[in-house]
A protein has these predicted regions:
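Phosphate-binding and adjacent anionic-ligand microenvironments
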Residues: 264-266, 270, 286, 306-476, ...
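Short Gly/Thr/Asp-enriched flexible loops that form oxyanion-binding sites at enzyme active sites
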Residues: 78-87, 130-137, 213, 275-295, ...
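Conserved phosphate/anionic-ligand binding catalytic regions in large, soluble enzymes, centered on
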Residues: 20-40, 123-126, 204-216, 355-361, ...
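Glycine-rich phosphate-binding loop plus the immediately following alpha-helix
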Residues: 136-164, 296-312, 316-326
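N-terminal small/polar loop signature for handling phosphorylated ligands or for N-terminal nucleophile
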Residues: 67-130, 221-279
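Gly/Ser/Thr-enriched, mixed-charge loops and adjacent short helices
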Residues: 15-24, 131-259
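An N-terminal, well-structured beta->alpha segment
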Residues: 1-83, 173-197, 208
Length: 527
């Protein structure tokens, strides 16, 4: 690249400038970026500096024990070992998980072992060239302000890396006991005595989920899921799915094909670090991936139906469906909306169940205060097996919910803009001149989320409430020059024959809202 830049290659020169212009920013999500040389990329020097800053932050607060985990991405094990070396050199007690493992195991281990913090080296579902660095504190939850700012300041204060002690040993590599403790807890999520007969087709998408998913299903008493052979082994290059996000079109094609060949009842996919879980089921017109909001409603329903008198709080992000709040209210449960991200959902006092529309679910917050694709898969399998024994399906439960609470249809729209400055300008325009109509529905209220309120911290976003139970939430992406729009339309359902008509009406309205948003802003749309 240096040679190409010296020879006048403009793209090579721009890449070099970007790599060395500033530092990779540490925030509530920690670090995440492409692996390459330079302070604005993920590499050993950036990780060493981050670990040194975290060590200083923890030492100033009396924290000592830190659990470090890693996934199977390129260099994840090296970044984890470097972190342990820096923490040990700073006088802290570093405990390294025994092998590449899912993120939920790290979140579980923090409180199980009484640690002051945890670090997970993963880029979750990002492309293969990326890696990341997530930080949790002693509550087992990802950091929120002001901890992110304070840790970032400690990182900035780190001097020359040559002066940072890095012993070659001295930290503890944990045994399998912590993994077995997690599995025992996960396997207890399905209640004893509930049906277990179910055929599941599963893919870990080249990530670290397979071994623990299979072990958890076995310990819980389910038949072994059928696994997509071509995607079974951890492979940091993700050869069959260059963008290994289960939400992306086409990513579930292989596992759905396996389900069709084998007559499976349920499709499950975990993302590469297994903290998220996608599901698909067969409908009369073919297999379809369930939206995150649909799975969230199903999991909440299963918790309620199997535990009469259930107590606690249900929570989901403000960009997720309003259906969860209606389900909670109907069963005497409190409901709390939060900002996006499990760092907020997991902090809700008294949480019993939380989810976000981006296929993240927390079904056992007493053990894992983060999204956990493995326990979510187990709870969904319990519901599917119970329904199978009754001669019913997950689709039937979704229909029941539509009849009781109205048909809730959610969708998303990404509005791409040239740069972050343009995104900010569009948000200003939407604040100053909000639309009066969207999809044929009157906008009767605009909430400026930068002002906070309703128990929510301030965040950059807008919420439009529509006449007839609908809403649009718009917020800028934190990583890309685009605006994310989250849409929901609610259609009443009367008799059974109204369901199909309600679905059609909702779809027409959502598509009209999308067109209105894109047209009003005069910019192209993307998924």
């Amino acid at each position: 690249m240096l040679v190409a830049a010296e020879q006048g290659d403009g793209s090579a020169r721009a890449e070099l400038v970007d790599r060395f212009d500033g530092r990779l920013e540490f925030g509530t999500a920690g670090l995440r970026g492409a692996m390459a040389a330079g302070p604005n990329r993920m590499n050993r020097l950036v990780v060493l500096r981050a670990a040194a800053g975290l060590a200083a932050y923890l030492a100033a607060r009396g924290g000592r024990r830190v659990v470090v985990g890693y996934d199977a991405r390129h260099r994840s094990d090296t970044f984890a070992a470097d972190t342990c070396a820096v923490l040990t050199g700073a006088g802290l007690q570093a405990m390294l998980l025994p092998r590449a493992l899912p993120t939920p195991v790290l979140a579980f281990a923090i409180r199980h072992l009484g640690a002051a913090a945890g670090v997970m080296v993963t880029a979750s579902h990002n492309p293969s060239q990326d890696n990341g660095y997530k930080v949790y504190l002693d509550d087992g939850v990802q950091i929120v302000p002001p901890a992110d700012v304070e840790i970032a300041a400690a990182i900035d204060a780190v001097g020359p890396l040559a002066s940072v002690p890095r012993p070659v040993s001295g930290w503890e590599t944990l045994g399998e006991e912590v993994v077995q403790a997690y599995l025992a807890r996960a396997a207890s999520v399905p209640l004893p005595g509930t049906p277990r007969e179910l055929r599941v087709a599963y893919t870990p998408l080249h990530g670290v989920g397979r071994d623990l998913v299979l072990a958890a299903f076995r310990q819980a008493g389910f038949p072994a899921p059928l696994v997509v052979d071509a995607q079974a082994e951890p492979d940091p290059d993700f050869p069959t799915v260059p963008f290994p996000n289960p939400e992306e079109p086409g990513v579930l094609d292989r596992v759905v094909a396996l389900a069709q060949r084998t007559g499976a009842d349920l499709v499950i996919a975990t993302d590469p670090d297994a903290d998220r879980c996608a599901a698909a089921v067969a409908f009369p017109d073919g297999w379809r991936m369930l939206r995150g909001d649909e799975v969230g409603a199903l999991l909440a329903t299963q918790l309620i139906r199997r535990e009469p008198g259930l107590t606690g709080v249900f929570a989901c992000s403000i960009v997720s469906s309003s259906l969860l709040g209606r389900i909670a209210a109907a069963h005497g449960l409190d409901y709390v909306p939060t900002l996006t991200g499990f760092k907020w959902i997991a902090r809700v006092p008294g949480l019993r169940f939380g989810y976000e529309e981006a296929i993240g679910y927390c079904v056992d917050p007493a053990a894992v205060r983060d999204k956990d694709g493995i326990t979510a898969a187990l709870l969904l399998a319990e519901l599917a097996a119970t329904l199978r024994a009754e001669g019913r399906s997950l689709g039937d439960v979704l229909d029941d919910l539509a009849r009781e609470f109205g048909l809730h249809l959610t969708d998303q729209l990404a509005i791409r803009v040239p740069d972050h400055a343009r995104a900010a300008a569009v948000m200003r325009h939407l604040r100053d001149a909000p639309p009066r109509m969207l999809g044929g529905r009157v906008v009767h209220r605009m909430d400026d989320l930068t002002a906070g309120g309703e128990g929510l911290p301030a965040t950059d976003g807008l919420r439009y409430l529509l006449v007839g139970q609908g809403r649009v939430v718009i917020r800028p992406s934190g990583t890309e020059p685009k605006l994310k729009c989250y849409l929901e339309v609610v259609e009443p359902v009367g008799a059974d024959s109204d369901l199909a008509r309600a679905r059609k009406r909702a779809r027409v309205t959502v598509d009209a809202i999308k067109a209105d948003l894109a047209g009003a802003l005069g910019v192209p749309t993307g998924s």
